[in-house]
A protein has these predicted regions:
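Active-site neighborhoods and metal-handling regions in enzymes and metal-associated proteins
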Residues: 1-296
Length: 296
């Protein structure tokens, strides 16, 4: 079952008359569209992409199962035409409540009459369980990042700036098929290595520094994300101790992970391991969750 079929089955289960999709992530996942200006209207049995003249050819090539409509001036007139064509004169239409701006929602309400109601649908839930073909793309994105990092390690040296290291890493990912970095690449060395989101700077990497990298590749719309920490030159006894504590906590988490285990419980397993080694107070007190997805 592809993305469109999964969405249409969900509309039937929820007894919705249709769904409006506007976010780039969901347009990519459910329609295959990678342009910047479009929205989709999907019912149980039909699917339309509404876009302007710049993307009609692209949408025709990318959006299998969708009818492509080019709007001229008012995008909502095209939606009304679709509703009239399929005799949808009322009911409940799903929208992306988390992604639709208030002004867009108000325009939508003004365009459709009082016979329509709107309900917010979290499409991320439909994307959460990955199909086999999605897993292939995710593994490819991870492999690209991993291979690029291995090359970086052969070039990384004291005297290089964090930004120079970032450029090498991102270039190696691009040469291996990544379309862009997953996010702003983090390279944090020395005193900056304690920053969870220490985006690369002009700081010079020095001998003896911890250097933390947080980076990822994008392949087929799927993002990888990995964090690696290295030492420039021989590690001190304290660096070895800290590295080993974090590594053991990670391995405990890997060993414990299984279907049905909550992220909170998994976090506690790793956190407790670090606390047992005397560094519980140094652990950042926040919860962080990321869903692997098509898009960003």
């Amino acid at each position: 079952m592809n993305g469109l079929q999964r969405l249409q089955a969900h509309l039937q289960e929820q007894q919705l008359n249709g769904m409006i999709i506007m976010s780039p992530i969901n347009l990519h996942y459910f329609a295959g569209f990678t342009g910047t200006t479009a929205f989709a209207f999907v019912t149980e049995n039909t699917a339309h992409i509404i876009t302007d003249f710049r993307y009609t050819e692209q949408a025709t090539q990318q959006c299998e199962g969708y009818t492509v409509i080019q709007y001229e001036t008012n995008v909502w007139d095209s939606l009304i035409d679709i509703l009239n064509e399929y005799h949808i004169h009322g009911g409940v239409i799903g929208i992306e409540g988390k992604d639709m701006p208030v002004d867009t929602y108000e325009l939508l309400c003004d365009a459709l009459d009082e016979h329509f109601d709107f309900t917010s649908i979290n499409l991320q839930e439909l994307r959460a369980v990955k199909r086999p073909d999605e897993l292939v793309l995710m593994r490819k994105a991870a492999n690209i990042a991993d291979e690029a990092f291995r090359v970086l390690l052969t070039k990384l040296k004291p005297g290089m700036s964090e930004n120079e290291a970032r450029i090498i890493l991102e270039s190696e990912m691009l040469m291996r098929g990544s379309t862009e970095p997953s996010f702003a690449t983090i390279v944090a060395s020395g005193h900056r290595s304690s920053m969870p989101h220490g985006v690369a700077s002009d700081k010079i990497i020095e001998a003896g520094d911890f250097v933390t990298f947080d980076f990822g590749a994008v392949y087929g719309g799927y993002h990888s994300d990995m964090t690696r920490t290295v030492v420039m030159g021989p590690a001190s006894d304290l660096q070895k101790k800290l590295y080993d504590i974090v590594l053991r906590a990670q391995l405990k988490g890997v060993e414990a992970v299984r279907p049905g285990l909550s992220g909170v419980d998994l976090d506690k397993i790793c956190r407790d391991s670090i606390a047992a080694n005397g560094y519980g107070d140094c652990f950042y007190q926040y919860r962080f969750a990321r869903c692997r997805r098509s898009g960003r």
